Every structure is written in C-alpha cells, then in structure tokens.
Regions:
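Short helix-perturbing small/polar motifs within transmembrane alpha-helices
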Residues: 1-6, 19-102
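Hydrophobic alpha-helical scaffolding
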Residues: 4-11, 30, 48-52, 67, ...
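Proline-rich intrinsically disordered, low-complexity coils
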Residues: 7, 14, 18-19, 47, ...
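A generic alpha-helix surface/boundary motif
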Residues: 15-16, 60, 168-172
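Acidic/His-rich, divalent-metal-binding segments that scaffold phosphate/diphosphate chemistry
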Residues: 35-37, 79-94, 107-201
Length: 201
C-alpha cells in the first residue's frame, strides 16, 4: 500500500521491530533468519530492490547486535539511535560515493530515518503485550525482578536478613558460574535470589 502511494515512504516502515522482538524472545539466529526472510520478500515488491535490501539488512543486523547488550528497558532508546545512525551513514556514504557535493544529500531522507527509528520504539509495548498474551518471560522482565527493591525481596530482607544475605551470595556465585559455561546467567541469578523466598512466612 505504501509503495503505491509513494515508493520513497517505504523507508518509514520500522522493519527492525521484527528482528528486535525475535531477539528478545528467542535468540540472534532466529532474529536474523526472520529478518532475512522479511527483507527478501519485501525486496521483490519495492523499487530499487538492491538498495532497499542493503539498507534493511545492515540496519537489521545492527539492531540485533544492539539488543544483545540490553541491561534495562531504557536501552530501547539506544537501539533507536543505532538504527537512525546506521540508516544515515549508509545513505550518506552511498550518495557521497556517487557525488562529491554535500548538497546532493536530501534532508527529507534523514527525517524518514528519524521517524523510522522512533516508530521502532513500538517494540517496547509489543514485548510487554506478548509476554502477557503468551505467558513468556524475557530477559527484560528478569532484569526487573532481579532488583533488590522488589516487594518480595525487600520483605525477605526485613523479616529474614540472614536468609537475604545468603540468597545474595548464592545469586552472585551462580551468575558468575553460569556466565563461565555460557548459560543464562540472569535466569540463574533470579532463581538464586528467590530460592528461599518461602522463609518470609
């Protein structure tokens, strides 16, 4: 539909949402496969297919890599910034490689890249929605409940301070050990933090 209205508006579509969601719920490999599939299919429907595929592949891979380093939900803004900068650098390099004049750069392209990056932030509420709909738990949720400021852990610290300190020590040890063998250190930490939560009563 967008292609029929204005082909250049295809750059407004936040295709990076799909690989971001796949990376958060599954892993990098699934995210990359899904993104490749979407880009190749859409590449056959838009004008300048090679340019479109090149833009989307590079930007999608950068978004997947950026998501890997999540430590909190606010990092979505960092991913959006990475997406904007990647689009902008690819476009700028492509134009300047053909024309030596900076005046050949189109300002509306950068505005499209910015809108695209902002729309990518819709992935945040979508993650929350999918977690609730399908009962899935992501690393982002684990990060939230691993905070010692959660009501359950605060009550444990207040009513059983010795047990709380024990849980903290086990959590730190578990996180280090699981990291060494390449497992999900965050999941191990959360499990260790709450393994004695029953002692609140």
């Amino acid at each position: 539909l967008i292609v029929r209205i204005n082909p250049s508006w295809v750059l407004l579509v936040p295709l990076c949402i799909a690989p971001i969601l796949m990376r958060v719920f599954f892993d990098m490999r699934v995210a990359l496969y899904i993104h490749l599939t979407i880009v190749i299919i859409l590449g056959n429907l838009v004008p300048n297919s090679f340019e479109f595929i090149f833009y989307q592949l590079i930007t999608g891979m950068m978004s997947i890599i950026s998501v890997k380093g999540f430590t909190k939900r606010s990092n979505f803004f960092l991913v959006a910034l990475v997406i904007f900068l990647t689009y902008s650098m690819i476009y700028t390099a492509g134009i300047l490689s053909q024309n030596t004049s900076w005046s050949s750069l189109q300002g509306d392209r950068y505005l499209m890249f910015l809108i695209n990056a902002v729309l990518t932030l819709l992935a945040y509420p979508m993650i929350y929605l999918f977690e609730k709909l399908f009962g899935m738990t992501t690393d982002l949720t684990l990060l939230e409940i691993s905070s010692t400021n959660t009501p359950a852990l605060r009550e444990l610290a207040r009513n059983a301070s010795g047990t709380f300190q024990h849980c903290m020590q086990v959590a730190n040890i578990s996180e280090d050990l699981i990291s060494e063998i390449g497992g999900n250190a965050l999941l191990a930490r959360v499990g260790a933090l709450y393994h004695d939560i029953g002692k609140i009563k």
